[in-house]
Amino acid sequence: MRFDDSDIAAVYRAIFERRDMRHFTPAPVDPAVLARLLRAAHHAPSVGFMQPWRFIRITDPALRTAIHALVEAERCATADALGERQDEFMRLKVEGVRECGELLVVALADGRERHVFGRRTLPEMDLASAACAIQNMWLAARAEGLGMGWVSLFDVDALRALLRMPDGAKPIAVLCVGHVDAFYAKPMLEQERWAARMPIEACLFENGWDDPASTDADGSHPSPAEATAEADADAATNIDADAASTSTTSIDGSPERIA
């Protein structure tokens, strides 16, 4: 049965207004809301119904501090690997581990090798399934008015050891969840000119892999600056982000203009 138009619009609104948040207020998250978010995550699709996700809620301040130290170490290592973009990267805020109301670590469960259905030729489908759970939680958080950020800057083995995970388990995400003063009008990395959203035409092929129409002759995509300029021209016709957050979003594709 088709959803009502208002329900459909709400789904698309959550998708297009979801943001990878890095700025949080210290306000606590209502335990009932957190429970709803985790339940939404647990109802994600998974290949072979393997349900590979495991969530560790971090409530120990010392553990939170230790996790932040791991993230900071990897942030510096990533900067060193970025060459000429090192300084630009270091100016970005890439996590909210210390500020967010709730901190969760998502891991792939141990014993995943026994799940053969759907993984015999694509063993990475356990990761894809867990990513679906994270996306479910992300959209639910946005609908609840909470921000969420996925942090992947950490040494996998170090975080596994810190949280006493069994052999075979693998941490894949540090999730910062909490209240925010405002949601970004556009993805933060787009706002900061780090990158820009590719046109859908560059990602959509028909009956085989084609060179996207927007791809240059040398095989490269437009530079972040060029793509961002185009996105800014589009954004000039958008409604104000604050007004968008309180208005009814249509279901004819226009919600994409908010993103």
Whereabouts are the PLM-identified features?
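Generic N-terminal amphipathic, Lys/Arg-enriched alpha-helix
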Residues: 10-27
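Glycine/small-residue-rich phosphate/adenosyl-binding loop
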Residues: 50-130
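Short hydrophobic/aromatic-enriched beta-strand-loop microsegments
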Residues: 78, 169-175
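Short, electropositive alpha-helical surface patch
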Residues: 159-171
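Glycine-rich phosphate/pyrophosphate-binding beta-alpha loops
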Residues: 43-48
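Extreme N-terminal tail/first-helix region
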Residues: 1-14, 90
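Small-aliphatic-rich amphipathic alpha-helix that forms the alpha element of a beta-alpha
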Residues: 37, 41, 104, 112-162
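C-terminal helix-cap and adjacent tail motif
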Residues: 3, 7, 21, 174-229, ...
